Amino acid sequence: MTSQSQGIQQLLQAEKRAKDKLDEAKKRKGKRLRQAKEEAVAETDQYRMQMEKDFRLKQAKIMGSQSHLSDEIEEQTLEKIKELNGSYNKCMESVIKQLLSMVCDMKPEVHVNYRATN
């Protein structure tokens, strides 16, 4: 009987050691998973920061060029307005004279398509 109880005790001890090893392996696995998760979060944060930095640089570059274009368009518009005002002042007198002569100097004529019926 003692040999049986010794065998049972050995089996129980072996089972306990196996359970302890499994528990230790589960703990190591959990620790590795937490560490991998932390590394992944750190890596994604670093990637996000780099992408945001690149985006801000590109945005600043584009906005700067748009500002330059808007200044250029404003300058061209002012030049065109000055040109049109100069043309207006130069031609205003002759256009008014021509318009008044067309309205005031009437020359009655018979239309070419008019047929006299007798």
Curated annotation (Swiss-Prot):
One biological process term in Gene Ontology: proton transmembrane transport
Tissues with expression: Kidney.
UniProt keyword annotations, A-Z: Coiled coil, Hydrogen ion transport, Ion transport, Transport
Amino acid composition bias (Basic and acidic residues), ranges on this chain: 14-26
Residue ranges of coiled coil: 5-53
A single GO cellular-component term on record: membrane
Biased composition (Polar residues): 1-12
Region (Disordered): 1-44
Pfam families, alphabetized: V-ATPase_G
GO molecular function: ATPase binding; proton-transporting ATPase activity, rotational mechanism
InterPro entries linked: V-ATPase_G (IPR005124)
UniProt similarity note: Belongs to the V-ATPase G subunit family.
Subunit note: V-ATPase is a heteromultimeric enzyme made up of two complexes: the ATP-hydrolytic V1 complex and the proton translocation V0 complex. The V1 complex consists of three catalytic AB heterodimers that form a heterohexamer, three peripheral stalks each consisting of EG heterodimers, one central rotor including subunits D and F, and the regulatory subunits C and H. The proton translocation complex V0 consists of the proton transport subunit a, a ring of proteolipid subunits c9c'', rotary subunit d, subunits e and f, and the accessory subunits ATP6AP1/Ac45 and ATP6AP2/PRR.
General function of this protein: Subunit of the V1 complex of vacuolar(H+)-ATPase (V-ATPase), a multisubunit enzyme composed of a peripheral complex (V1) that hydrolyzes ATP and a membrane integral complex (V0) that translocates protons. V-ATPase is responsible for acidifying and maintaining the pH of intracellular compartments and in some cell types, is targeted to the plasma membrane, where it is responsible for acidifying the extracellular environment.
Protein's UniProt name: V-type proton ATPase subunit G 3
